[in-house]
From Swiss-Prot:
Glycans are attached at N48, N58, N61, N94, N116, N163, N192, N267, N280, N291, N379, N493. SUPFAM superfamilies: Hemopexin-like domain (SSF50923), Metalloproteases ('zincins'), catalytic domain (SSF55486). PANTHER family: MATRIX METALLOPROTEINASE (PTHR10201), MATRIX METALLOPROTEINASE 1, ISOFORM C-RELATED (PTHR10201:SF291). One of its GO terms (biological process) is extracellular matrix organization. This is Putative matrix metalloproteinase. Hemopexin repeats lie at residues 311-356. PROSITE patterns: HEMOPEXIN_2, ZINC_PROTEASE. It holds the Pfam family Peptidase_M10. The active site is at E180.
Length: 501
């Protein structure tokens, strides 16, 4: 018979093994658990597009409708819309018109100016329309599947683009609807120039990427079990290399200073921009003239924020839905893609996002999740998640204290997004973290993953048409070929490019 002390030792050893296994599995779950949604991709064909299994309807039988607008002939509108849906039906989807626009899955409306969806139109020119992606997991439909067209525009009704010059400043409605309906049924932008979803005006024929994108969303999606639709060549299509332009990457982004651009709102809605604006416009904010009147003087916090802004002092800078946002104290500036400031700004951050904070605060980070929800980081460690459709606050998340254990102060931690990856940085310690849980994805993150050297005193990193580093001394530097630009004495004052007053 085994002595009692030996039995105790065996029990202790077994207990230690069990504890080690439990701890190991727990750490594995904490640090390697990804909340990303896997996207099924057909690797047998070249692809240049981004798809999400979230964006799409739960059926291939899709109803559509259009609300007439007095300015346009109803027959012209219906003929144009019918032509658009007939083209998209070549992908294997079945589109059916119904009279009641409120009951349709894809709904086309004409609106002017502010129309209560947080994306006001700007009158004739520039912004032509936008569309909201469908979401198969949403219980409430909301704006999903809606296409909004700026009713102040002058459209002509012709599905051929060869003779656009004959119509002066008129806009081809067929081209706009064809692209926007693509978004309304779930497609993001494509980097393939032959695609309808390429972010510039194109023809009226679907490209290979358009077919492949619909296949991945509706026929080869792991959430569905339909028979996979076989692509048939309805017309001759050019195939291109699967590589994408260097400026495009895997993001739904594109250069904003090119002619005939379709300006997109990333992962939520897409905005179509009239192609005839000044081609010399850049993403750099244009000069702003502030008239400090007595009304400003009664609001000391706003006056202080404006003075800080004009001297180059910012808390963070980010691109949200394709537009530049600069945050200073409790206020933020919002710029159009051509660098012009939206009317009425700066506004309090709580005006745009219902951050439940009483008293003074500052935004220290702002980014979008992979599914398009907007996250506002306040005072370094608190993050508020806003729904991509309703813009309602649905979650508050604290940055885990153990994330950067050697960080001397949480107020030195910055969170930023680069090329669809989220990072936390403190005292030159870098960790890739999960968009949703803010937990660590890797025990060790290589600095080379960032594509730029770690610089001290950073307050944020901006990734849009290049990578820019911002420091707490009101200066910035552009990263060129994975190096900080040394030809301009490294860092320049923010007032040279970003906060021009």
């Amino acid at each position: 018979m085994m002595p009692q002390y030996e039995r105790k030792q065996i029990i202790i050893h077994i207990s230690c093994v069990i504890i080690c296994v439990v701890v190991t599995l727990t750490l594995f779950h904490v640090f390697w658990n990804d909340n990303y949604i896997a996207v099924d991709v057909n690797y047998d064909v070249p692809y240049n597009f981004s798809v999400s299994p979230d964006f799409g309807f739960n059926t291939t039988n899709i109803t559509w409708s259009l609300k007439p607008y007095y300015k346009y002939d109803i027959n012209d509108l219906m003929n144009t819309a019918n032509s658009v849906f007939k083209i998209w039906s070549r992908t294997g989807l079945n589109f059916t018109y119904i009279k009641n626009v409120d009951e349709a899955m894809v709904r086309i409306y004409f609106y002017r100016q502010d129309h209560n969806d947080s994306f006001p139109f700007d009158g004739k020119g520039k912004i032509l329309g936008h569309a909201f992606y469908p979401n198969r997991h949403r219980i409430n439909r909301g704006l999903a599947g809606e296409v909004h067209i700026d009713a102040d525009e002058q459209f002509y009704f012709n599905d051929k683009l060869e003779n656009m010059s004959e119509y002066d400043d008129s806009i081809n409605l067929h081209a706009i609807l064809l692209h926007e309906v693509g978004h309304a049924i779930g497609l993001l932008h494509s980097a393939n120039k032959s695609s309808i979803m390429y972010p510039y005006y194109g023809g009226s024929k679907l490209g290979v990427d358009d077919f492949n994108g619909i296949q991945q969303i509706y026929f080869a999606n792991k959430y569905k079990h339909n028979k996979i639709f076989t692509y048939n060549k309805y017309h001759k299509l050019e195939t291109t290399s699967s590589s994408t332009p260097s400026y495009y990457g895997n993001r739904d982004r594109y250069p904003i200073n090119k002619k005939r651009s379709l300006s997109s709102v990333f992962n939520i809605t897409t905005t179509t921009v009239k192609p005839s604006y000044d081609k010399n416009n850049t993403f750099t904010p244009q000069k702003i003239c502030f008239n400090i009147t007595s009304s400003y003087k009664t609001h000391n916090t706003k006056l202080t924020a404006i003075r800080k802004y004009c001297t180059g002092h910012i808390d963070t800078i980010s691109v949200i839905r394709g537009e530049l946002y600069i945050f200073v104290d409790e206020y933020h500036w919002r710029f159009r893609s051509n660098g012009l400031l939206y009317s009425g700004y700066p506004l309090k951050t709580t005006h745009s996002w219902s951050v439940p904070i009483i008293g003074r605060f500052k935004v220290t980070s702002a980014f979008e999740t992979l599914t398009g929800d907007i996250v506002i980081g306040v005072n370094y460690t608190t993050f508020y998640y806003f729904d991509r459709m309703s813009m309602q606050l649905y979650r508050m998340q604290k940055l885990p204290l153990h994330l950067l254990p050697r960080c001397r102060s949480t107020k030195k931690t910055i969170v930023f997004s680069i090329d669809s990856h989220l990072y936390a940085l403190c005292d030159r310690i870098i960790r890739e973290i999960d968009f949703n849980s803010l937990r660590m994805k890797r025990m060790k993150t290589k600095r080379s993953m960032l594509g730029f050297p770690l610089v001290s005193n950073l307050i944020t990193v901006l990734d849009h048409d290049g990578i820019y580093l911002f420091r707490n001394d009101n200066t910035y530097a552009e990263v060129i070929r994975s190096r900080v630009d040394s030809s301009s004495s490294y860092f320049k004052n923010n007032t040279d490019k970003w906060t021009i007053c």
